């Protein structure tokens, strides 16, 4: 039996540590340094703008309701209920795996070239493409540009608006990486799952989901129906990358070390300590208003993630148990062969 005095001392040190952490987050961010960094570094400004959009846009209850009304919930939950369950906390992992399957196989489609709405032609019958500005109607749905093709069969113009409005994507149900990640992030949020939008500077995006069962952030890519395979980009696709940044409701974090296992591109557009400072400042701003207990919980989770991302850290038993096999399919699954080759994502 543990001597009560040791329990008392342990509780005292834990309380002091908790108070220390809480006070850290209550310290004001040096705004002069933030403003100077945003003025002098273009990349810092880009991250700041993305944080303003991506950290809050999916917190929309009306959108969540629209997603749940559109998806086949009976089918999704029936499939989840058939999956093996070691612990109640594993249920959300199974739900995410089923959402990945459902989204890729039953709901959303990949668009190499759009289908002609006039005659239904597709593939080699569709030629182009020029880039045009959106029409007034297309612009209503946060459309930045439109790919315009020509149908050889019926001589019609075929338009592929690159919509950024996830509710419009719920209607069109087609797109490429950006559209897939955009809507799937909203799908995860609609099911009450903690999720991040992961942005890669070399033109790819995916998600992460916080697993209560594994107690860590899990890589999730709806294009590939991939769960907990962070190695696929640098290993399987042979993709070269520089920065991977995660955005979510309560933070901005550099997760590059989780994904860039080889083919590291130079990281020279912002000083490393400036990037760390900016992420910390943006995270502090997002956590304004949290209770002391919530702030402490987030800090502890952040701390564990940094141990995971730090390659020099000694792995815990839990980390060793959760090691994943860095094998699998060579190259990317989604997209045409020509498109994947042009992006350096075909595994060669």
From Swiss-Prot:
<dbReference type="InterPro" id="IPR002931">
    <property type="entry name" value="Transglutaminase-like"/>
</dbReference>
<dbReference type="GO" id="GO:0006515">
    <property type="term" value="P:protein quality control for misfolded or incompletely synthesized proteins"/>
</dbReference>
<feature type="compositionally biased region" description="Basic and acidic residues">
    <location>
        <begin position="338"/>
        <end position="348"/>
    </location>
</feature>
<dbReference type="InterPro" id="IPR050883">
    <property type="entry name" value="PNGase"/>
</dbReference>
<comment type="similarity">
    <text>Belongs to the transglutaminase-like superfamily. PNGase family.</text>
</comment>
<dbReference type="GO" id="GO:0005634">
    <property type="term" value="C:nucleus"/>
</dbReference>
<keyword id="KW-0378">Hydrolase</keyword>
<keyword id="KW-0479">Metal-binding</keyword>
<dbReference type="GO" id="GO:0097466">
    <property type="term" value="P:ubiquitin-dependent glycoprotein ERAD pathway"/>
</dbReference>
<comment type="function">
    <text>Specifically deglycosylates the denatured form of N-linked glycoproteins in the cytoplasm and assists their proteasome-mediated degradation. Cleaves the beta-aspartyl-glucosamine (GlcNAc) of the glycan and the amide side chain of Asn, converting Asn to Asp. Prefers proteins containing high-mannose over those bearing complex type oligosaccharides. Can recognize misfolded proteins in the endoplasmic reticulum that are exported to the cytosol to be destroyed and deglycosylate them, while it has no activity toward native proteins.</text>
</comment>
<feature type="active site" description="Nucleophile">
    <location>
        <position position="177"/>
    </location>
</feature>
<dbReference type="GO" id="GO:0000224">
    <property type="term" value="F:peptide-N4-(N-acetyl-beta-glucosaminyl)asparagine amidase activity"/>
</dbReference>
<dbReference type="GO" id="GO:0120125">
    <property type="term" value="C:PNGase complex"/>
</dbReference>
<feature type="binding site">
    <location>
        <position position="151"/>
    </location>
    <ligand>
        <name>Zn(2+)</name>
    </ligand>
</feature>
<dbReference type="InterPro" id="IPR038765">
    <property type="entry name" value="Papain-like_cys_pep_sf"/>
</dbReference>
<feature type="active site">
    <location>
        <position position="204"/>
    </location>
</feature>
<protein>
    <recommendedName>
        <fullName>Peptide-N(4)-(N-acetyl-beta-glucosaminyl)asparagine amidase</fullName>
        <ecNumber>3.5.1.52</ecNumber>
    </recommendedName>
</protein>
<feature type="binding site">
    <location>
        <position position="154"/>
    </location>
    <ligand>
        <name>Zn(2+)</name>
    </ligand>
</feature>
<keyword id="KW-0963">Cytoplasm</keyword>
<feature type="binding site">
    <location>
        <position position="119"/>
    </location>
    <ligand>
        <name>Zn(2+)</name>
    </ligand>
</feature>
<dbReference type="GO" id="GO:0005829">
    <property type="term" value="C:cytosol"/>
</dbReference>
<dbReference type="Pfam" id="PF01841">
    <property type="entry name" value="Transglut_core"/>
</dbReference>
<feature type="active site">
    <location>
        <position position="221"/>
    </location>
</feature>
<feature type="binding site">
    <location>
        <position position="116"/>
    </location>
    <ligand>
        <name>Zn(2+)</name>
    </ligand>
</feature>
<keyword id="KW-0862">Zinc</keyword>
<dbReference type="GO" id="GO:0046872">
    <property type="term" value="F:metal ion binding"/>
</dbReference>
<feature type="region of interest" description="Disordered">
    <location>
        <begin position="311"/>
        <end position="348"/>
    </location>
</feature>
<feature type="binding site">
    <location>
        <position position="224"/>
    </location>
    <ligand>
        <name>substrate</name>
    </ligand>
</feature>
